[in-house]
Regions:
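Beta-strand-turn-beta hairpins that frame and shape the catalytic cleft
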Residues: 1-4, 106-112
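Core catalytic region of metal-dependent phosphoesterases/phosphodiesterases
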Residues: 2-99
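Residue-level detector of flexible, active-site-proximal loop/helix-junction positions
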Residues: 10, 105, 120
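Structural preference for beta-strand elements that scaffold enzyme active sites
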Residues: 56, 102, 111-113
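Short, flexible active-site-adjacent loop segments at beta-strand->alpha-helix junctions, enriched
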Residues: 61-63, 102-104, 117-118
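Active-site-proximal segments of metal-dependent phosphoesterases and phosphodiesterases across multiple
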Residues: 74-81, 111-123
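Short, charged beta->alpha transition segments
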Residues: 97-109
């Protein structure tokens, strides 16, 4: 099995499309190590795409903050503004999806995926 491992997409549809184009026909399955949203201008488009195309996703710190699971008070000013905007922009279905993402590590085919580190998702 050949995996395309994505992480820190941060709602950047344009960059996601560039990565997918570069990797075209060179993977069997996509995995995501979190931070689907945060910073970028396309939180719903990216989340919709991830929901439809990525069977295994773990949550990242921005997924938690943007969906209201975790406080973002320690974020820098730009990240705070982005988090508020993303939270207000997400559809209810995408908000629920992000809230339901599992904490890593998650075992996949003999290895683990995580956001941060296997010891802590925020490391």
């Amino acid at each position: 099995m050949r995996y395309l491992i994505l992480s820190d997409i941060h709602a950047n549809q344009e960059a996601l499309e560039a990565v997918l184009e570069h990797a075209r026909n060179r993977y069997d399955e996509i995995l995501c190590c979190g931070d689907v949203v945060g910073y970028g201008p396309d939180p719903n488009r990216v989340t919709d795409w991830v929901r439809s195309n990525v069977p295994t996703v773990v949550r990242g710190n921005h997924d938690k903050a943007c969906s209201g699971i975790e406080s973002f008070e320690d974020y820098n000013p730009a990240a705070k503004l982005s988090t508020v905007w993303t939270n207000q922009s997400l559809t209810p279905g995408n908000m629920d999806y992000l809230r339901a993402l599992p904490q890593g590590p998650v075992a996949v085919d003999g290895f683990d995926i995580a956001h941060g580190s296997p010891a802590g998702e925020d490391d």
